[in-house]
Amino acid sequence: MDDITAPQTSAGSSSGTSTNTSGSRSFLPTFSNVGVGLKANVQGTLGGRQTTTTGNNIPKWATLDQANLQLWTGAGWRNDKTTSGSTGNANDTKFTSATGSGSGQGSSSGTNTSAGNPDGLQADKVDQNGQVKTSVQEATSGDNLTNYTNLPPANLTPTADWPNALSFTNKNNAQRAQLFLRGLLGSIPVLVNKSGQDDNSKFKAEDQKWSYTDLQSDQTKLNLPAYGEVNGLLNPALVETYFGNTRASGSGSNTTSSPGIGFKIPEQSGTNTTSKAVLITPGLAWTPQDVGNIVVSGTSFSFQLGGWLVTFTDFIKPRAGYLGLQLTGLDVSEATQRELIWAKRPWAAFRGSWVNRLGRVESVWDFKGVWADQAQLAAQAATSSTTTTATGATLPEHPNALAYQISYTDKDSYKASTQGSGQTNSQNNSPYLHFIKPKKVESTTQLDQGLKNLLDPNQVRTKLRQSFGTDHSTQPQPQSLKTTTPVFGRSSGNLSSVFSGGGAGGGSSGSGQSGVDLSPVERVSGH
């Protein structure tokens, strides 16, 4: 497939660029047609009018002032309390400390109205039942609230061009790095336990399924969100989140009862201690001019976002089980926050994602870090001198740590329960109960073969011709698992993708793993 390195003009010409093998003109993503993260999503979704979410008894979402989108924090500002009824912020670090916006402390008293501080938004708080609260005090107290107090409408979608932008990182190219950034920043995979339980417990440690044993017994137990989804909600503007209570030192058990995210939780020196991770995304209505100074070095690239210099290490071609994000404050006066490190090795490393013809996000994850961490914890538990009955055991290494999953929305987590009288009980009507669950996880050598097929020029060329109806060959197609291949087209100002795929032959195997049907995605021609 020909290498495309320069964007084409609206007339279809390009500078030093050849057409793709299909013979049809393609339009490369440019800074004008790659979505601008949160701002483009909000404007395109709400369009200056009220939007109603699906489900019974769900209130309309008030229209956002498009001139003040910087006040909206998307997935929300988490303000967990130390104990029930406590008025303090258990996590200490304030929103303004992480973002540099405003000068207030983000107290729950409602007196702070600094720009960028979501605690100053008194009309954008929603409880678990979807009821809008009119004051900060109402929205940050009580047991029936979600941990996120500023959640977006459930129908927000990521930028339409992010699958295309993602594919442009296969070359160590600064333009492609920025295309990737523009289309994907704000869709960083964040693995968070589901919230909004009926019993108001919000987060449960047992909801986090990462063990190799669970994968063997039931592949659908893995609590993996699709790319850029948190609790089934897209993550366009999650600015800061916390690990919550971490596991006690040497115990090897996860004692998280408040939020836990799927990156490696560091061991702490004592019980009930907390640590945090800061995620910088386009939540404050950033524009193309806000992102600059992109530097590509080896397998890493850096860029400036507002007052931060963000560096992705080993991101263009990540090592197994390793992904680093370094945030460096450009304001030298903030010595204590000059450098923040995201977990260098998450529990699962993202390997690729696409959208099938049904609109479902399919992705590949690397679990080497998961099982390595578990083996280390098991070994520590077995040799711990503080435990008299230590029974740790190293988990067996999986023969292939790549896991393929098709994600779908768990309908049972978003439905209204009915009482005996036929009346609808609204306790389960929260739009935040959408939860993405893996439909199937493939972890066999069949996946390896399918990924290799993606890189086979002959396979790519053949499938592209078939997609455009130019290949009349009767050559039988390989029966191994095929992954998707994007082709760039133009549709109503955005890019559309053509994905090829087929089913994995052979049906179900004795291990309970069956083939995955990846039907071709049809090309959209909306112009």
From Swiss-Prot:
Family: Belongs to the adhesin P1 family.
Record field: compositional bias (Low complexity): 9-26, 108-117, 248-262
Chain residue ranges for the region called Disordered: 1-26, 76-148, 248-269, 468-527
Gly residues bias (residue ranges): 500-513
Signal peptide: none
Biased composition (Polar residues): 82-95, 128-148, 468-495
Record-linked InterPro entries: Adhesin_P1_C (IPR004940)
Name of the molecule in the record: Putative adhesin P1-like protein MPN_500
Family annotation (Pfam families): Adhesin_P1_C
